[in-house]
Amino acid sequence: MSYTITQAQIRKFDPEVKGVYQANSRLGGVFHENNALGASTYQVTRLGYGIGSISVPGADIPNMNSATLPTTISLENWNHAEYVDYFQASEVNWDAIGKSATEVCAPAAGRRKDQIIINALDQVPATYDIAWNYAGNAAGISERMVQHANALLSHHAVPFEDRYFIAPYSVLEIMLSTQEFVTRQWVGELRPALEGKLVNFGGFKWIFMANNPEGGMPFIDNNDGTVTYNCFACHKRALEVAVGEGNVGGSGVPMLRIDRVPEKGSWLVNAPLSCGAAVVENKGIIRVKAKVPAMA
């Protein structure tokens, strides 16, 4: 009887859990995602550049010998679980279980996926970092910094399509109050980002991140009332994501788990996530430093 009810609960709440999970993952649809269901590691392969050769009549056609560059992604296993006491949710009243699943567990899983991606982005070497004071900048991210990030990606033949700029909301606040953006009327293009919408600006699709409890965007406290964030100007295929448990991309596997735990007198509501990410092309990611006032 209890097993049947548990399965009914999963069928009832799983679609909503998946929707909330995706809605709370700002970066979930940005980078290429691989189905690694049942695996602890996942290998992705990138092909290097090849240079053609001039045609010589009667001669053999030489091979370009483009390199094969494998990268192994290690998946991290996370539980996002809450116990719901029997007295809070009887087998007939599922409201407490539903609230735990959709308001606590699923959002936490979505934020964790973002954090795994952010942590992987921050592993890129400092070769192409843009300093917070580039070209005389005083705070936030300037027009020149955006242009320079775009130029660096273009210099390395990174495709123009699917370029993203990932930054915290505190950077957006400064951009919207900076004279150079306002006078060029770019403020009109940026303002929808205040509502969490994806905006196109300066050759990038901009995504602004909240200060999530999982860690959020990497930063350094300058101990002077300011912090310096690591932001990222990057291409969609510069980083690969692998998702096992919690894969909602057509695997048919429920994301929600509801288990009865008699010794605790509770239901265990869980949105497990097995996920990993790795940089596959260093030249496709530019770390941009942004100095902003610290927020409580």
What do these predicted ranges mean?
Residues 35, 39, 66, 120-131, ...:
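Charge-rich, low-complexity amphipathic helices
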Residues 51-55:
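Short, solvent-exposed loop/turn elements at domain surfaces
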